[in-house]
Amino acid sequence: MRKALKFIGAVTGALVVLLALGLWYLSSRVTVRGPVLHAIAGIGGAEATTDSVSGLRLAPGFTLDVYARNLGPARVLRFTPAGDLLVSVTRAGKVLLLERDADGDGRADAVRPLLEGLDRPHGIDLADGWLYIAETGAVRRVRFDATTRTVSGTPQRVASLPGGGMHFTRTLRVGPDGALYVAAGSSCNVCIETTPRAAMLRIEPATGAVTSHAEGLRNTVGFDWQPGSGDLYGVDN
């Protein structure tokens, strides 16, 4: 019996080591790896370099280079009215501010934390002097001055969101009607949801009232409105 237990323990240990080595190998060798490895172990790929991006094929007239380094596993990007770039780093719990390229060298002039200590922030957007942040369990907002590149006060809770489960990121956009639209992915692959999940939620910024805008979406990571028609298009993962 003891020999059998030792054998099972040895085999299990070997499998764990092989899995760890496999994940490490994939993280540095395989091109299409990000979402799977990020979900399993929080592993991203190697940092992009000028050489690594030079092999990507682009449409005629486009060029590609590294704009900023050492950001961590960045997720959502949003430009400010001043031309700076806000970046959510979900697993680090922060939002970064990348100062616009004023000197024309093709790089962000500076990178600094704008907000820290957040609960897995993902979606970010700006409207009426507010920076809106979609955490995994809530939408918050904080006053943001694009000219001085500063926030004031502490983030206020606008509305609560269903948290936990497999899809924990929440994508947020301010809609053409001024309401907040938040994608809350399903809690698992095959679920009968008891909370508003696998759905697009509409939130009134002034009151925090939450209604369901669309359902049966699984996990809409990116979405936007078509100019002119106002139709809403989303990409599910």
Where are these regions (language model features)?
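N-terminal Sec-pathway targeting helices
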Residues: 1-18
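Beta-propeller domains with acidic blade repeats across secreted/periplasmic ectodomains
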Residues: 17-237
